[in-house]
């Protein structure tokens, strides 16, 4: 198991002349985890997040970062906030400079980075969030999703170990929400611990490693999503709704269907459950194959050559740069979120598909497909497109 990076021990906090917002809670977060604090408005999620980088100090109890109690002197908070980056719910409250470049440069400049290093980290951060070429744009001309990306870039420029986001998809349409969640997935795969707050169970359920269900400053339940959301009474008390897949699973059980295996975490899991239930097997003589097009290694010409001989193939893109390449090359995308599972579902129908991805996400594709193959016993081949640079 990976080591603990954040830990709370019996922490409490009461706002001046207000009710107790955090009521003696304890928990831990491990390095490289994806965590969601889930609950209704007023549950204490935002207050707890603000404690993680020292914006709010507990009245009692201990908060630890990397196994050391958080100290609240200026020098200690400065180091903590470099390691634990915070993205506010409303990016307009976080973006303060007249241009995108100046805003992203604000943090590293204040940390004393030399000018050439500031330029390097800002360029890298903007590339990471898909905003290359936006350096001189005024923030007020950006869309809500673009502003959110600027705020994330400003935090990434300081290279934190932990990224904390308060309601990261607030105010975004479904497509924008999917893009932000996939960006966070990409950052997590690169080694960052990601902590979000949300009241959207459909967003949290398939995404998190663990969820912490909160109500009135207390923890109702925590654990893997199937456990955290698996008690309908707790979910009801938190004024939330069950994730659709879990609700369907529960309703099937109530009707006398004997469901085998784990509770469904994704649509792919649900399909496996249903097919096992009805003893359905795929009629295809063999599953389809998945090809990977690494935009960091393959040229647009490589794709054109490949696609000329593979018309009708479903195409998905995962990762900011992959989606940018698709847009620049006018490549129609069938999938932009949950891409790996959707390509596996296509393969089970005997159909081939292509995943556009980046260096950092290639391993994740292999890991997810191999995990499914090992669990199901169905052989699905994953190939790299030929002609890429080493």
Question: How should these model regions be labeled?
Answer:
Residues 62-79:
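ABC ATPase NBD Q-loop/coupling interface
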Residues 1-8, 12-24, 31, 36, ...:
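A short, flexible loop at the N-terminus of ABC-type nucleotide-binding domains that lies
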Residues 216-217:
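Conserved ABC ATPase "signature" C-loop
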Residues 235-325, 338, 356, 364-368, ...:
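ABC ATPase nucleotide-binding domains
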Residues 116-134:
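Conserved ABC ATPase "signature" region
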